[in-house]
C-alpha cells in the first residue's frame, strides 16, 4: 500500500452521525468520486463505511474508528476493541492516535501496533509533535501522519497546515511522513509533497460540502 500512495493523494471520506452526509452508501459514492478524480487511497471511519468503500472502489483503505471514552481524550482508534473491529475489515492500514496522552483503560499503544502487525496490516501513527513522531518510529509504526497537530493542547495551534512539523519529521524520522490536516488547496498539497511528504491526506476540503460552502459564505461577511 505504501508504494501505491507514494507521491499521490489520499482522500478522507468521513461523515459522523451529526453530519448531513452520514451514510455508508453516501461515503461509498464520495469515494467513487474521489477515485475518479485520481485519489490513490481512501481514509475511512467505521466498519460499515470501510466495507462499503472497499466494495465499490477496490482502493487501498486507511481504516479508523472514532469512539469517545470517559477516561481519555483519545478518540481515534483508542483501544484494542477498535483495532479488533478494524481487523475484521479488509482495510490495508489502520491509523490510531499515537500522541503521548493516556489511552482509555490504561491501554498501551505498542500492544495495538503489535496486534495490527500480527494480522499483516500496516499501522499509521496520528501524531501532533516531533517528539511523538520520533516515538512512533521507535514503537514500530509503518508511517507517521501530522493529523493531530493543533488538536492536542500542547501542540502548535493554527488554522493552517503545519508545514514546520512536516519538515522536522521528514528530516528526523526514516519512516514515511504523511501530511494531514487543514490542507485546503491544491497548492498546499503540492507544497507538502515538495517539502518531502511521502503522501498527503485531504478530507474536508474535498468531501465536506458544509465546510466548503462555509469558506465561500464567510468571504461575504
From Swiss-Prot:
Induction: By N-acetylneuraminate. The keyword Iron does not apply. SUPFAM superfamilies: Ribulose-phoshate binding barrel. Keywords: Carbohydrate metabolism, Isomerase. It comes from the Bacteria. GO terms for biological process: carbohydrate metabolic process; N-acetylmannosamine catabolic process; N-acetylneuraminate catabolic process. Converts N-acetylmannosamine-6-phosphate (ManNAc-6-P) to N-acetylglucosamine-6-phosphate (GlcNAc-6-P). This is Putative N-acetylmannosamine-6-phosphate 2-epimerase.
